[in-house]
Amino acid sequence: MARFFPLTLTILLFFIQRIDFCHTLVPANETFKFVNEGELGQYISEYFGDYRPLDPFTSPFQLCFYNQTPTAFTLALRMGLRRTESLMRWVWEANRGNPVDENATLTFGPDGNLVLARSNGQVAWQTSTANKGVVGLKILPNGNMVLYDSKGKFLWQSFDTPTDTLLVGQSLKMGAVTKLVSRASPGENVNGPYSLVMEPKGLHLYYKPTTSPKPIRYYSFSLFTKLNKNESLQNVTFEFENENDQGFAFLLSLKYGTSNSLGGASILNRIKYNTTLSFLRLEIDGNVKIYTYNDKVDYGAWEVTYTLFLKAPPPLFQVSLAATESESSECQLPKKCGNFGLCEESQCVGCPTSSGPVLAWSKTCEPPKLSSCGPKDFHYNKLGGWITT
């Protein structure tokens, strides 16, 4: 009988733990049920959407319902304060592409599950944390919304489910979420064609054309291409840190860990003020930018502190000597020049016509449609009006 004792004890401890979880309830004063109804917010928000603020708030972050159309609301975290009179930006979304309607509900019940449901009761999104020991919900100062147990352990966190944005301290991780996906357009909150993907051997940007089942890689972050043959990426985290003890400068970087080393960091920019309230975003057009919020000012609190693809190279005196990931030309953006696609020095090349003249570029520029690939379908156009010297 002695040999069965460890197994019996293990089973007994398991059931005791399960019983403990079943009796752990969220205190009544911590539960809530919000209905998506009533007045809309008065201040300007990103994508010019309407919004309704909810009670969960930790400066400068607040949980909200927001929309661009009256019947399609997204549950999201907003970053920004009213007193700065600056644009409020959306840094996390629960239900992108699966909106809820007026009178939808957000419920945090005694069982510890956070549930977003439409007005007819249909569940649109949830944390799936029912009866797992959750005792509370809070938004941390870094913008991470968490559900935690009686010991303070996070049983669910918004940092584990990024959409197109990484806040400071947020990561892409192998075995979890490994990519950011762009938004389709300012007025359409569904997944767009661009993605920032962490793969075993690098961090890459991809574009998914509507005409192809396979995404096209259009950029690779340089430092991550130097991994040894026998190591692979495990995580990439957006971070800030003091450059020195005096706190005169702050570094924004992408830190990474690998399978057999501590990893390293790709420094993106060096800023002269505290950049804790920053986020990295994959933009609608496929660019990558960092936005930094200065909560110490009353106006113009937002600043773009990094742009991967620039219209023109920055002046030499503005180039950060600390940066290891330099900016590139906008010509690398897949749809910079529409379907015609010819770009030089961040400028779209004019459109040649069958009659000869080259017209100024416009969004309607596109290559001619060929009926076949036969030699008869190819010819040169004579360009008149040129003077040779």
Curated annotation (Swiss-Prot):
What domain of life? Eukaryota
Chief subcellular site?
A: secreted
Q: Which one GO biological process term can you cite for this protein?
A: water transport
**In the UniProt record, what gene is named as encoding this protein?**
EP1
Q: According to its UniProt record, in which tissues is this protein expressed? A: In 14-day old seedlings, expressed in the epidermis and apical dome of the shoot and in the hypocotyl, cotyledon and epidermis of the root. In developing seeds, expressed in both the inner and outer epidermis of the integument.
Reported function: May be involved in the limitation of water flow through the outer epidermal cell wall, either by direct modification of wall structure or as a signal instructing the protoplast to restrict water transport across the cell wall.
Checking PANTHER family in the record gives:
BULB-TYPE LECTIN DOMAIN-CONTAINING PROTEIN, CURCULIN-LIKE (MANNOSE-BINDING) LECTIN FAMILY PROTEIN-RELATED
Q: Which organism is it from?
A: Daucus carota (Wild carrot)
Q: Where is the signal peptide?
A: 1-24
**What name is this protein filed under?**
Epidermis-specific secreted glycoprotein EP1
Q: Which GO terms describe its molecular function?
A: carbohydrate binding
Q: Domain Bulb-type lectin, which positions?
A: 88-193
PROSITE patterns, alphabetized: BULB_LECTIN
